[in-house]
Amino acid sequence: MPDSYLLQNIDLVILAGGKGTRIKEFLGNHPKPMIKFNNKHFIQYVLNCNSKFNFKRIIILCGYRNKIFFEKLDKKLKNLTKIICIKEDKLLGTGGALTNLKKMHVKDFVLINGDTIFNINLNTLISSLSKKKIGIIALTKNKKQKSKKLLNLALRDKILYFKKNSSIMNGGVYFFKKEILKNIKNKKSSLENEILPKIIKSKKIQGEFFNNFFIDI
């Protein structure tokens, strides 16, 4: 299957509703992906990083203070016809926000965090997914090793499990089959802390390690 075909039939979904409590002094009342670097919003760098892939659509899920998000960014995105922004009436977290994809009739999709850049080949990630799994997570090196729960990649069959002080961590880039949405209810929840742990335990998701450029704000 050609690389171009893979992404032409897949949506890119960006989680852009984070509050950014760790960097609040730099954000003010703005959503985390709206922080500026060199007079450019971070989410614009995220979009530029993924513009080389020919996605069917780009769907941005906006949560925290989404009005500011639209006021600041809407003019810059108006010429990008494939981009759709979805506002949340109430904050649903990184898990609950994905329920908005059901009304968009989303099938298989790539999911990325709006506060992360992980410059990997998404075609490679998608092609690596086993037919028996419903998703795959891109993993990167954990240089700080401070998180309590990090994803470690087993040596056999690319099976994921949790391990403290692991040298490998979740890179914030995923490819999911549409079946993942059946595991998410329309209520506030965390993808990282509630939904993924259950799916990992059921062995329905796998991991793939990449040694590419990674930054998380």
Label each region the model flagged.
Residues L15, F37, L61, I86-E88, ...:
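Generic beta-sheet signal
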